[in-house]
Amino acid sequence: MKVILKADVKALGKKGQVYEVSDGYARNFLFPKGLAVEATSGNLNDLASKKANEEKKKEQEKQEAQTLAAKLSSLSIEIHTKSGEGGRLFGSVTNKEIAEALKASHGINLDRRKLELKEPIKALGTFNVQAKLHPEVTAQFQVHVKAS
């Protein structure tokens, strides 16, 4: 019997895949637990339309990430913080502070976990910050850290 998996099943496969399994395994295990449905033509059509919608949604997310990346790469952000002698900061500038500065100065709401710093910013100056907006799209922008 052919079944379409509704969830990942260990030792069988991933959600959305079609498999040939024995009738007993399907009726006694997969169907009662809601892990699979029978692969009828209607269910296969539903699966195909869901996959097409997912692809369209992923492509749209990628396009949005690319437009945001183009916008971010032209920006630079200023952060004012307390510093000691020789340009060393008291503490460091974190992703959270950079994300807040982005929102305050340019109105871009970006999750702090998407910002990648090679190392914490602990001095005054200009630094490049990379933002991973999508698995295939990254943007780089400058952060100017100045004494307050």
Swiss-Prot record:
GO molecular function, one term: structural constituent of ribosome
Domain of life according to the entry: Bacteria
PROSITE patterns documented for this protein: RIBOSOMAL_L9
TM region(s), chain numbering: none
GO biological process: translation
Alphabetical list of Pfam families matching this protein: Ribosomal_L9_C, Ribosomal_L9_N
PANTHER family tied to this protein: 50S RIBOSOMAL PROTEIN L9 (PTHR21368)
Reported function: Binds to the 23S rRNA.
Protein name: Large ribosomal subunit protein bL9
Gene that specifies this protein: rplI
